[in-house]
């Protein structure tokens, strides 16, 4: 911190199918970083996995196709080498903390978190175990079910073990939802009613992951809340928010989330009885701990008409786009966007020390 400001590397882009969502999220993070407090260094992770120095100009992040690469030094405690297109490599100014805004595989699955640990540089956000456990929906379900938490019934599908459509229909009923086990943002998710739907869903799903989940349909409201851990380990759980997909979308799809501006109505806070909301927040805390999460997560639920609460998913790097729920439920709970950033940084520094 030679300048008196904390040097924070913001990673965005990435190799996953959620690359474009990451760019939107990181743009908002860059806007929220206090320039009087932080020296923000945006680093674009290409679809091939290169870390290229970027710039934030007029509210937009540059996405270079080539240029200077940033390489962390193993055990370097924040040291990094810049490899330019031309000329000799040189040592960059010391990095104080890494802030990954990478969604999905190779960013939210423990990979970048492990790299930061190898380099001995602090990292904002969830650590290795929670990231890996939460991103894999199959493993996450097994862990929270073992802890006694309710989830949708599901069948795990691999390339080697593909059940017949009739078997899934018998086990789960119709419709069925097919989803990649290790993707987010509803990428590769399909609503299946017929054998033809099933074959199409399998073909598409396996382009995103080698493991899929077939899940039962639950007629319910979709409710989410945010968890934020302070530097001392205390958890703050936000009010709940509700997602209501437009009638033009049969479920909360990628298009409803990010493409169609009218695809979703978000109600913050959700209109829920106090007892139900308190139970949702308690389950969110329990699931967060069971999966080994720390720092931050968004926890998603189904709430049925008879007030049964079903845990859906946990996202350890939730979306930070204009339409994303995490910052909205935190704001209505009294935590502003810049304060989220400050708390994540403080937590990462405390854990790194």
Curated annotation (Swiss-Prot):
E.C. number: 6.3.2.4
Cofactor binding note from Swiss-Prot or TrEMBL: Binds 2 magnesium or manganese ions per subunit.
InterPro entries named among the record's database cross-references: ATP-grasp (IPR011761), ATP_grasp_subdomain_1 (IPR013815), D-Ala_lig_Van_CS (IPR000291), D_ala_D_ala (IPR005905), Dala_Dala_lig_C (IPR011095), Dala_Dala_lig_N (IPR011127), PreATP-grasp_dom_sf (IPR016185)
Keywords: ATP-binding, Cell shape, Cell wall biogenesis/degradation, Cytoplasm, Ligase, Magnesium, Manganese, Metal-binding, Nucleotide-binding, Peptidoglycan synthesis
Residue sites binding Mg(2+) 2 per the record: 313, 315
Cofactor(s) essential for the protein: Mg(2+); Mn(2+)
Pathway the protein acts in: Cell wall biogenesis; peptidoglycan biosynthesis
Domain ATP-grasp as annotated: residue spans: 141-346
An MF annotation (GO) of this entry: D-alanine-D-alanine ligase activity
GO cellular component, one term: cytosol
Gene Ontology BP terms: cell wall organization; peptidoglycan biosynthetic process; regulation of cell shape
Location within or outside the cell: Cytoplasm
A Pfam family per the record: Dala_Dala_lig_C
Catalytic activity: 2 D-alanine + ATP = D-alanyl-D-alanine + ADP + phosphate + H(+)
UniProt family annotation: Belongs to the D-alanine--D-alanine ligase family.
Protein name, UniProt field: D-alanine--D-alanine ligase A
This protein's encoding gene: ddlA
């Amino acid at each position: 911190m030679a300048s008196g400001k904390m040097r924070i590397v913001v990673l965005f882009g990435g190799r996953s199918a959620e690359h474009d969502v990451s760019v939107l999220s990181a743009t908002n993070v860059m806007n929220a970083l206090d320039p009087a407090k932080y020296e923000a260094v945006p680093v674009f992770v290409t679809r091939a996995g290169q870390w290229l120095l970027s710039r934030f100009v007029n509210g937009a992040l540059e996405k270079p196709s080539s240029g200077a690469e940033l390489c962390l030094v193993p055990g370097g405690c924040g040291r990094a080498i810049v490899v330019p297109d031309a000329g000799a490599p040189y040592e960059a100014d010391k990095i104080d903390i890494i802030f990954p805004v990478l969604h999905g595989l190779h960013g939210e699955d423990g990979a970048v978190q492990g790299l930061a640990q190898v380099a001995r540089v602090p990292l904002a956000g969830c650590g290795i175990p929670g990231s890996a456990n939460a991103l894999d929906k199959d493993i996450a379900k097994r862990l929270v079910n073992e802890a006694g938490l309710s989830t949708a019934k599901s069948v795990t599908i691999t390339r080697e073990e593909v059940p017949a459509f009739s078997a899934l229909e018998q086990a789960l009923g119709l419709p069925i939802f097919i989803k990649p086990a290790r993707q987010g943002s509803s990428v590769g998710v399909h609503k299946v009613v017929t054998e033809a739907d099933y074959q199409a869903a399998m073909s598409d799903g396996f382009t995103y992951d080698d493991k899929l989940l077939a899940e039962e349909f639950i007629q319910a409201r979709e409710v989410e809340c945010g968890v934020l851990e302070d530097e001392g380990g205390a958890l703050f759980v936000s009010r709940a928010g509700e997602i209501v997909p437009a009638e033009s979308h049969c479920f909360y799809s990628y298009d409803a989330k990010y493409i169609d501006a009218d695809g979703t109505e978000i109600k913050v806070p959700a209109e829920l009885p106090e007892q139900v909301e308190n139970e949702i927040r308690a389950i969110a805390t329990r699931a967060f701990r069971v999966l080994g999460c720390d720092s931050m997560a968004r926890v998603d639920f189904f709430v049925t008409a008879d007030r049964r609460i079903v845990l859906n998913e946990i996202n350890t790097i939730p979306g930070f786009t204009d339409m994303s729920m995490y910052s909205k439920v935190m704001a209505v709970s009294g935590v502003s966007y810049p304060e989220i950033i400050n708390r994540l940084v403080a937590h990462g520094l405390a854990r790194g020390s």
